[in-house]
Amino acid sequence: MRVTQGCFSFLPDLSDEQIKLQVGYAMSKGWAVSVEWTDDPHPRNSYWELWGLPLFDVKDPAAVMYELAECRKVNPEGYIKINAFDASIGTESCVMSFIVQRPINEPGFYLERNEVQGRNIQYTISSYAVQARPSGDRY
């Protein structure tokens, strides 16, 4: 099951040249760019591991591409995304985020139903990858 989070998630994976163009666009807007990775892509897991520090004053997309390449070396089967942060007054938020790498095999999620007080049903989404292996050894 293909994880769909962020911009471009329903499109085919971006090439490195397309990623570089998107990073260049973010930098042309004055946005700070960062690289993050995880092995738990649960939809509510919004806090991925930050790779290095955000690249605040970097003006060349090649620097981001270098950091992305280093992150890919260390996390060859993890999820990696690029974020762009707009620090301008009134926004101060992540304005663009997209996955740039994913594992070859994405096992997907399962729905767990639990009956609670008053015959109410609670639903939980869990990842098959998280269920099968500990953190750091999932892909």
Curated annotation (Swiss-Prot):
Predominant localisation class: plastid
Biological process annotations from GO: reductive pentose-phosphate cycle
Localisation per UniProt entry: Plastid, Chloroplast
Domain of life: Eukaryota
Transmembrane segments: none
A single Gene Ontology CC term: chloroplast
GO molecular function, one term: ribulose-bisphosphate carboxylase activity
Sorted UniProt keywords: Calvin cycle, Carbon dioxide fixation, Chloroplast, Photorespiration, Photosynthesis, Plastid
The family this protein is said to belong to: Belongs to the RuBisCO small chain family.
Record's miscellaneous remark: In this alga, in contrast to plants, the small subunit is encoded in the chloroplast. The basic functional RuBisCO is composed of a large chain homodimer in a 'head-to-tail' conformation. In form I RuBisCO this homodimer is arranged in a barrel-like tetramer with the small subunits forming a tetrameric 'cap' on each end of the 'barrel'.
Assembly and binders: Heterohexadecamer of 8 large and 8 small subunits.
Function: RuBisCO catalyzes two reactions: the carboxylation of D-ribulose 1,5-bisphosphate, the primary event in carbon dioxide fixation, as well as the oxidative fragmentation of the pentose substrate in the photorespiration process. Both reactions occur simultaneously and in competition at the same active site. Although the small subunit is not catalytic it is essential for maximal activity.
UniProt name for this protein: Ribulose bisphosphate carboxylase small subunit
Native source species: Pylaiella littoralis (Seaweed)
